[in-house]
């Protein structure tokens, strides 16, 4: 039972693709592929995250372009594996989020991918648009990965937390009782990456070394933490619409050292994680990290300092490398769609009930 999962997250760095096998008693991650976005595509996608002229046309063109990139990722996986395309049951493609607005009335979430075109380019069944059904059922449409976390990482005797540090940070609680819950804590890498790009020209702060060279500006940090989202109770989700440099700018005096702001933004990510853990899961002692932020040594060190007595590891220790968890999740969500099985967790998203997610484009 071969499936492909494709994820391109809010960090806008590129495409993660995986080839997985669900046929055995346990999940198998067979092959992986990463394709970085070029500067022009990344800039175009960033431009669509804000209101502008001719948005519908630009979104349609970019959706087609992205589908070509996604097809390229699928092709590379097949080359690596030697598996015949006809053996792939489905491709689960999240698409590239450009708007996430799950308000109670007229809520929506838009991910760029042309599912019909991707099905034509690959000759495979494609599943996309995973978030809309949950929002239609009164949910946030996010986070969706906790259902996969429960399937893969739950332990019958140990309460675990899975913390995904992507553009946005989300946390999944996997209690022994099985009552899974989770939510978006706040910005993960998103603000750090944007500040780093603006002031160094680099797309991210490797290992958090630039942040480490600065100092935390505590008044700025406390000002940022006073933002209402952080005190909202779950279920809740967020995105680039809420957290961007436009959000940060009014909080700056203008004379701060750029490395100090970077250090403060890293500490914001750390604090929103630790505050979430201490508020909702104070007794949990096992934390597992995934997503790009899991490789930020400065962030992980500060997280360990803020959460003494907890064991913090990568999800690699549970059998899935930290970089590929989300892409694997969308392969699993595609399987749930094909098998007409639920893909959301109402306790996480706030939906009125379990739903089969995704729109299917047959091969």
UniProtKB/Swiss-Prot annotation:
Highest taxon, organism lineage: Bacteria
Keyword DNA-binding: no
Pathway: Amino-sugar metabolism; 1,6-anhydro-N-acetylmuramate degradation; Cell wall biogenesis; peptidoglycan recycling
Pfam family, one: AnmK
Uppermost EC category: transferase
Chemical reaction(s) catalysed: 1,6-anhydro-N-acetyl-beta-muramate + ATP + H2O = N-acetyl-D-muramate 6-phosphate + ADP + H(+)
Molecular function GO labels: ATP binding; kinase activity; phosphotransferase activity, alcohol group as acceptor
Annotated residues for binding of ATP: 9-16
Keywords noted in UniProt: ATP-binding, Carbohydrate metabolism, Kinase, Nucleotide-binding, Transferase
Oxidoreductase in keyword set: no
Gene3D superfamilies: 3.30.420.40
EC number: 2.7.1.170
Family: Belongs to the anhydro-N-acetylmuramic acid kinase family.
Function as written in the Swiss-Prot or TrEMBL entry: Catalyzes the specific phosphorylation of 1,6-anhydro-N-acetylmuramic acid (anhMurNAc) with the simultaneous cleavage of the 1,6-anhydro ring, generating MurNAc-6-P. Is required for the utilization of anhMurNAc either imported from the medium or derived from its own cell wall murein, and thus plays a role in cell wall recycling.
PANTHER family per record: ANHYDRO-N-ACETYLMURAMIC ACID KINASE (PTHR30605:SF0)
Protein name from the UniProt record: Anhydro-N-acetylmuramic acid kinase
The organism of origin for this protein: Nitrosomonas europaea (strain ATCC 19718 / CIP 103999 / KCTC 2705 / NBRC 14298)
Gene assigned in the entry: anmK
């Amino acid at each position: 039972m071969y499936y492909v999962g494709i994820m391109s997250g809010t960090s806008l760095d590129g495409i993660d693709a995986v080839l997985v096998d669900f046929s055995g008693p346990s999940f198998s991650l067979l092959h992986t592929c990463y394709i970085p976005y070029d500067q022009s595509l990344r800039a175009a996608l960033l431009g669509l995250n804000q209101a502008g002229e001719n948005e519908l046309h630009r979104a349609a063109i970019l959706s087609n372009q992205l589908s070509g990139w996604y097809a390229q990722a699928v092709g590379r996986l097949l080359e690596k594996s030697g598996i015949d395309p006809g053996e792939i049951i489905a491709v689960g493609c999240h698409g590239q989020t450009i708007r996430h607005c799950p308000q109670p009335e007229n809520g929506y979430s838009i991910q760029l991918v042309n599912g019909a075109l991707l099905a034509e380019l690959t000759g495979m069944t494609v599943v996309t648009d995973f978030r809309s059904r949950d929002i239609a059922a009164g949910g946030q449409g996010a986070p969706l990965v906790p259902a996969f976390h429960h399937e893969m990482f739950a332990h019958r005797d140990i309460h675990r937390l899975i913390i995904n540090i992507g553009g946005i940070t989300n946390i999944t609680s996997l209690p022994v009782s099985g009552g899974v819950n989770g939510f978006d804590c706040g910005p993960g890498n998103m603000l750090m990456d944007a500040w780093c790009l603006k002031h160094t020209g680099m797309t991210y702060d490797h290992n958090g070394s630039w942040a480490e060279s600065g100092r935390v500006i505590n008044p700025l940090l406390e000002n940022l933490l006073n933002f209402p989202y952080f005190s909202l109770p779950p279920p809740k989700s967020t995105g680039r619409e809420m957290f961007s440099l436009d959000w940060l700018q009014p909080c700056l005096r203008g004379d701060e050292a750029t490395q100090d702001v970077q250090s403060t933004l890293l500490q914001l990510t750390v604090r929103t994680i630790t505050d979430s853990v201490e508020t909702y899961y104070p007794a949990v002692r096992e934390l597992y990290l995934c997503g790009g932020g899991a490789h930020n040594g400065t962030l992980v060190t500060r997280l360990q300092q803020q959460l003494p007595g907890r064991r913090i590891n990568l999800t690699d220790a549970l059998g899935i490398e930290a970089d590929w968890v989300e892409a694997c999740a969308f392969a699993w969500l595609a399987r749930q769609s094909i098998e007409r099985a639920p893909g959301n967790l109402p306790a996480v998203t706030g939906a009125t009930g379990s739903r089969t997610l995704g729109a299917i484009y047959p091969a």
